[in-house]
């Protein structure tokens, strides 16, 4: 990329000064622009890619408006292609991977994560792409090695529960339900330690509930499963507040599982009450 095409502080100012976005729904975005747009000099006061990163963290309960997205995309691409900022490639991947940025494109996300896969957060998301076949062909072998690397180097809760899925289902590895169970509990410990996202916690609790449903149906296992599903529902609903609308199907599935567990519990209680002949 030729240097003259990079976004300069004055060009960045003009783009953001004219940006159309929902001010009332995006108070954090408005505050960031107030802090870093110098109306007297008509330029921004920090590097564009740093401003882009701050805007990515703002107003998570609102789908990103196109003008803000386009600025972030341009600023991060400049950062990556001009100085090979590896973190810019990771953020670009996130920009196209997560729903709240309003421009999901798994192929672009996979390509950006692949450029700098040695960066921890990129590695787990690259593994997730290979696991689900997002933006690339599904490949459990590649997924496994990305997830193992992320689990060992970053202690990622996300990588741990996906590794649990691989052992639970026998994807690339031998099926091992106890190992899957241990990985899910380890993922939960890590998620609590680092205060992971609501979505990550929900995914873990959903899996713990399901793995306990595979056990003999006792009051203890069923009560644990129900508690896990209740927490999964709570965290999925929290995640939906951050514009992860595709999770509504997850919430429906969890509520069906809650109903199933309650029916098992009712049957057990009725059996206990039946007189012995």
Residue ranges and their predicted role:
Residues 241-277:
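Terminal, low-structured helical/coil segments at or just beyond the last alpha-helical repeat
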Residues 35-36, 54-57, 89-98, 123-132, ...:
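Hydrophobic face of amphipathic alpha-helices that form TPR/SEL1-like repeat modules
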Residues 22-26, 40-44, 48, 59, ...:
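Short helix-capping/linker turns of helical repeat alpha-solenoids
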Residues 182-189, 222-245:
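TPR/TPR-like (Sel1-like) alpha-helical repeat modules
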Residues 6-9, 59-72, 103-107, 139-141, ...:
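Helix-turn-helix repeat elements of alpha-solenoid scaffolds
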């Amino acid at each position: 990329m030729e240097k003259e095409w990079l976004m300069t502080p004055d060009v960045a100012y003009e783009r953001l000064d004219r940006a159309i976005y929902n001010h009332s729904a995006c108070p954090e975005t408005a505050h960031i622009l107030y802090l870093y747009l110098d109306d007297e000099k008509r330029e921004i006061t920090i590097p564009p890619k740093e401003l882009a990163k701050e805007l990515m963290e703002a107003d998570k309960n609102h789908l990103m408006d196109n003008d803000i997205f386009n600025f972030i995309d341009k600023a991060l691409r400049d950062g990556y292609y001009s100085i090979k900022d590896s973190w810019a490639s990771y953020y670009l991947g996130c920009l196209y991977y997560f729903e709240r940025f309003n421009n999901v494109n798994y192929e672009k996300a996979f390509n950006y994560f692949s450029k700098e896969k040695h960066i921890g957060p990129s590695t787990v998301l690259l593994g997730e792409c290979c696991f689900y076949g997002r933006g690339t062909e599904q490949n459990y072998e590649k997924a496994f090695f990305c997830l193992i690397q992320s689990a060992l180097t970053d202690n990622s809760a996300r990588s741990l529960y996906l590794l649990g899925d691989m052992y639970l289902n026998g994807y690339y590895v031998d099926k091992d339900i106890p190992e899957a169970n241990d990985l899910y509990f380890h993922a939960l410990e890590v998620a609590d330690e680092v205060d992971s996202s609501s979505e990550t916690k929900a995914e873990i609790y959903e899996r713990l509930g399901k793995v306990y449903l595979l056990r003999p149906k006792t009051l203890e296992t069923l009560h644990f499963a129900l508690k896990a599903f209740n927490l999964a529902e709570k965290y999925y609903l929290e995640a939906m507040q951050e514009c992860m609308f595709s999770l509504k199907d997850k919430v429906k599935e969890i509520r069906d599982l809650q109903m199933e567990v309650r029916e098992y519990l009712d049957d057990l209680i009725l059996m206990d009450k039946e007189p012995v002949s």
